[in-house]
Amino acid sequence: MAQIRHPLFVSITGKIDNMVFYRRNGKVFLRRLPVRKKRKPSESQLSHRRQFTAVIAFYRVLKSTFLLQVWRAAVENTLMNSCCLFVKHNCRAFDDNGKLTDYTCLRFSVGPLARPYCLKCRWLKEENAVRLTWKNNVRVGKQKTDDQLVTVIVYENDEFTVYSPQQTGAVRRDGTVTLLLPPDSSVPCAAYCFFAGVSSGFYSKDCYCRIRTD
C-alpha cells in the first residue's frame, strides 16, 4: 500500500488494472490487488469440455434443418432451452475427445408419440436409395395413422441427410417408404426414423436402425 500525494490523483478512486485507488481520512492510497492463480483444469474437465464443444457444434448444424422445430417443440412450456435438451440427450454419443463414436446413443428427436416398431433398413445400391419398413403398435389409434414420417440418414463419412415429412411423403399406416439419396453420397450406415403429429405439434422419439448394405 502506498499513499498518493500528487494533486493529479486527489479525486481518483476505484480500480485500474490490478491497482485500487481509495480514500481514507482525506488521503488517497494505492493498493495492488492480489494475483489469483488460475487452477489448471483436470483431465476430466478437459474431456468434458471437448465433449460438450462437439455436441454444441453438432446442434448448430441441426439448427439449419427441419430438426430445430422438433427440439423447440420438446421444450415448450418448460424452463429448458432446446440446445440444453439436445446436449443432455446426446453427450453419450461422443467420446472424451469429442468424436462421434456411438451412433446408438445419438438422438434426433424426443416426444410423446409412439415410435415406429420393427424398423428395418436396406441400401438399394443400384437405385442409390434406402428402403425403410416398420410396423405399428396395435394400441395406436386410427387418428394417429396419419402421423408423418421424418427420417435422418447418416453416412460412413459422418455426413447426414434430413428428410422432412414433406420429403418422405410417408405416414404411419404406410409401413414402408423408399428414399432416394443425394447424388455422390457416401455409403449410408444408419437411419433414424420418427413420427410427427399432423396437427398436434408433437413428435415421437426416434428409432435407430443399422442400414443393411449386403
Question: What residues fall within each predicted segment?
Answer:
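Long, polar/Ser/Thr-enriched low-complexity segments
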Residues: 1-117
